[in-house]
Amino acid sequence: MGEEHPRKRSRQHFEAEARNVSLFESPQCETSKWYFSREEIERFSPSRKDGIDLVKESFLRSSYCTFLQRLGMKLHVSQVTISCAMVMCHRFYMRQSHAKNDWQTIATSSLFLACKAEDEPCQLSSVVVASYEIIYEWDPSASIRIHQTECYHEFKEIILSGESLLLSTSAFHLDIELPYKPLAAALNRLNAWPDLATAAWNFVHDWIRTTLCLQYKPHVIATATVHLAATFQNAKVGSRRDWWLEFGVTTKLLKEVIQEMCTLIEVDRRRNMPPPPPPPRRELSWAIPAAVKPVHMARAYPFHSYPLQSYRQAGIW
């Protein structure tokens, strides 16, 4: 029997999972360490120990980020708060396993907690109702059911249990630094033109959804993002060739981060590329085919305008 779609699980199944909050793992790692190597993330996460492979965990990460974006927009909270919740989830699942912690519960609790951390209060009742409606959007009666007293209080307790687990797992460390402030400072200091700034902001929004924020500090991500956006825009930034040194980023580190970013872009490009068309049906023909002239086609990027090969050109540094 195939795997059940996460959005179509029964209400009873979801609630039964969350009632077992006491079965959630206790933090086993050093909570003061919030940055990890790529090897730690890909090979030694708690989920990996429970048999969840990298592809599955990446899918779950994408799922809770998409869910958080939808939930945040439904509640009209800022993008900073939504991004803060995403990072909370990233950190949580470097301490706890997806196998034992439902991502919809953790994501909902993360957004509620992020609203508090970012001084953007949001009523718990609003979070509960909005989350339930998104989770069970396939069920026409969900919007009515969540307003019933018993269902509402049961789901509210689930979210509060998730919040308690998030707090204990993070050792109450809620001061999350995002790349937005250092990016704004860098763009202002370098007098970046509007198109470059827009590209950089869009990149940062994408990086928040990945493990990049678990590998590098915000000012490093911001600096590398400006360099990447400038390269794609063929724009010159800064008055000196190695302007990134002014932001405390070495050339070696910059190259390392940009390589990670290019890998993420390439993975995203392949994921969004449609499957190749089936080969044309061959029909028998006794006619002698005429000579065909060679056709030279220019390489194009129909799905992404990210010329990754530009980083292989000489003299880019």
Swiss-Prot record:
A Pfam family reported for this protein in Swiss-Prot or TrEMBL: CycT2-like_C
GO biological process, one term: regulation of transcription by RNA polymerase II
Tissue localization of expression: Abundantly expressed in flowers. Expressed in roots, seedlings, rosettes and stems.
Any coiled-coil regions, as ranges: none
GO CC terms in record: nucleus
UniProt keywords, alphabetically: Cell cycle, Cell division, Cyclin
InterPro entries per the UniProt record, alphabetical: Cyclin-like_dom, Cyclin-like_sf, Cyclin/Ssn8, Cyclin_N
Record text on subunit structure and interactions: Interacts with CDKC-1 and CDKC-2.
Family: Belongs to the cyclin family. Cyclin T subfamily.
PANTHER family: CYCLIN (PTHR10026)
Stated name of the protein: Cyclin-T1-3
Protein source organism: Arabidopsis thaliana (Mouse-ear cress)
Gene: CYCT1-3
